Amino acid sequence: MKVALVTGAGRGIGRACAETLAASGWKVAVGYRTSDADAKETLEAIESAGGVGTAVHLDIVDEASVSDAFKQANEALGPVTGLVNNAGFSRDGLLLKYPLEIYQRTLDTNVRGAFLCTREALRTMLRTRWGRIVNMSSVISLRGNAGQTAYAASKSALVGLTKSLSREVGAKGITVNAVLPGLLDTEMTAHLTEQARAFYIDQTPIGRTAHLDEVAAVVRFLMSDEASYVNGAAIPVDGGLTA
């Protein structure tokens, strides 16, 4: 069984990805930062379905924490050869009044965090000459949105990281891809007004928000052997929003 580490796996898309990967045969390290209870729920869901996993505390912006989390995962489950960089942060606000410290936190969480986790994962992947990396970006990286300059910049950076790294490591049996979800009903989007939510849905040809398992299914494919020729892709899962 291959081993994957999913960041931000205590809830939302991360939990859906962790459970879906476990159901498809991966051992899963449930990466989390704040809530022991959330991580426990994810792990219990994995194990109750017959999967194998472990929970690892992980602050993705802290280099030592990242190194320790991968060490724990390697010792508990085996060499980590799959990584889903899912943990993220978003806070909306117009640029002119946007606090610099929140801008920096957005970039640190969404870009630095993915960089540190990817660098750590590559140490094992390069030795085994096999690996799968999926970065959770956003359709905002393609179309932008007023009030989300920081978030859009960070998610666009993830696409750039994905495409550049795919050229660095593709010949080593490692693929790197990005998934770009549209609007989801998660804690990160709970702040949206009904008017804003209705606007997004109206712009989406399918006419609804995405389901978590729909995004997780794309991640599962990109992590599989069947996706061995998919590399450097940025795949929207947005109901046609960016068509």
Q: Which sequence ranges carry the predicted segments?
A:
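Short, small/polar-rich loop/turn modules that mediate ligand/substrate recognition or access, typified
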Residues: 78, 170, 175, 230-232
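Alpha-helical segment proximal to the catalytic Tyr-Lys
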Residues: 123, 167-168, 228
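Residue(s) in the substrate-gating loop at a strand-loop-helix junction
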Residues: 138
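Active-site helix of classical SDR
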Residues: 118, 154, 162
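Conserved glycine-rich cofactor-binding loop
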Residues: 10-12
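Substrate-binding pocket helix/loop in short-chain dehydrogenase/reductase
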Residues: 94-95, 99-107, 189, 200
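A conserved structural motif in NAD(P)-dependent oxidoreductases
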Residues: 205-215
